[in-house]
Swiss-Prot record:
Identification of the protein by name: Protein AV2
Organism: Mungbean yellow mosaic virus (strain Vigna) (MYMV)
Functional note: Through its interaction with host SGS3, acts as a suppressor of RNA-mediated gene silencing, also known as post-transcriptional gene silencing (PTGS), a mechanism of plant viral defense that limits the accumulation of viral RNAs.
UniProt GO BP: negative regulation of gene silencing by regulatory ncRNA; symbiont-mediated suppression of host innate immune response
Entry keyword annotation includes Magnesium: no
Length: 116
């Protein structure tokens, strides 16, 4: 856990509360398998807490909240079948590599020349 004597304190009380919330969520996250729906939701919630702009965090939380509310408690430990479009996830990169056949080359995008 976080040691206040070794690490710097956040500059505001709100930052301190967010930091404690993130540490608590990371602790809970250890109890879920890494491919489960609960793990995905906890990861997204941690990302929301790390956002510095209030409006953006509020939007992301409002998008996440209905999914978490509708999820059954038993489903949180089962593997997640969510499609991620962020491009950062390893499973997304693997899928992109599999989708393109090896014998097909990429074509160049040609610019449109206007007729005058």
């Amino acid at each position: 856990m976080w040691d206040p004597l070794v690490n710097d304190f956040p500059k505001s009380l709100h930052g301190f509360r967010c930091m404690l919330a993130i540490k608590y969520l990371q602790y809970i996250q250890e109890n879920y398998p890494s491919n489960s729906l609960g793990f995905v939701y906890l990861t997204e919630l941690i990302q929301v807490l790390r956002i510095r702009k209030h409006a953006k965090a509020e939007l992301r939380y409002r998008l996440l909240y209905p999914d978490v509310e509708c999820a059954e408690e038993a489903d949180l430990r089962h593997p997640a079948f969510l499609t991620c479009h962020c491009g950062k996830c390893p499973c997304q990169r693997e899928k992109e590599e599999v989708d393109q056949p090896t014998h097909v080359e990429e074509t160049e995008i040609l610019s449109v020349i206007p007729l005058s």
